[in-house]
């Protein structure tokens, strides 16, 4: 019974993290750009 209440409350608890979840898929693109800028800085050795 208590677990059912906790599971029901979970979506409300995760509303705080929705902006973070929206940003997460963009992070690999930033790593790709960082690698490109780093290679450009050292002259594509």
From Swiss-Prot:
<keyword id="KW-0674">Reaction center</keyword>
<dbReference type="Pfam" id="PF02533">
    <property type="entry name" value="PsbK"/>
</dbReference>
<dbReference type="GO" id="GO:0009535">
    <property type="term" value="C:chloroplast thylakoid membrane"/>
</dbReference>
<comment type="function">
    <text>One of the components of the core complex of photosystem II (PSII). PSII is a light-driven water:plastoquinone oxidoreductase that uses light energy to abstract electrons from H(2)O, generating O(2) and a proton gradient subsequently used for ATP formation. It consists of a core antenna complex that captures photons, and an electron transfer chain that converts photonic excitation into a charge separation.</text>
</comment>
<keyword id="KW-0793">Thylakoid</keyword>
<protein>
    <recommendedName>
        <fullName>Photosystem II reaction center protein K</fullName>
    </recommendedName>
</protein>
<keyword id="KW-0934">Plastid</keyword>
<dbReference type="InterPro" id="IPR037270">
    <property type="entry name" value="PSII_PsbK_sf"/>
</dbReference>
<keyword id="KW-0602">Photosynthesis</keyword>
<comment type="similarity">
    <text>Belongs to the PsbK family.</text>
</comment>
<dbReference type="InterPro" id="IPR003687">
    <property type="entry name" value="PSII_PsbK"/>
</dbReference>
<dbReference type="GO" id="GO:0015979">
    <property type="term" value="P:photosynthesis"/>
</dbReference>
<keyword id="KW-1133">Transmembrane helix</keyword>
<feature type="propeptide">
    <location>
        <begin position="1"/>
        <end position="8"/>
    </location>
</feature>
<keyword id="KW-0472">Membrane</keyword>
<keyword id="KW-0604">Photosystem II</keyword>
<keyword id="KW-0812">Transmembrane</keyword>
<feature type="transmembrane region" description="Helical">
    <location>
        <begin position="23"/>
        <end position="43"/>
    </location>
</feature>
<dbReference type="GO" id="GO:0009539">
    <property type="term" value="C:photosystem II reaction center"/>
</dbReference>
<keyword id="KW-0150">Chloroplast</keyword>
<comment type="subunit">
    <text>PSII is composed of 1 copy each of membrane proteins PsbA, PsbB, PsbC, PsbD, PsbE, PsbF, PsbH, PsbI, PsbJ, PsbK, PsbL, PsbM, PsbT, PsbX, PsbY, PsbZ, Psb30/Ycf12, at least 3 peripheral proteins of the oxygen-evolving complex and a large number of cofactors. It forms dimeric complexes.</text>
</comment>
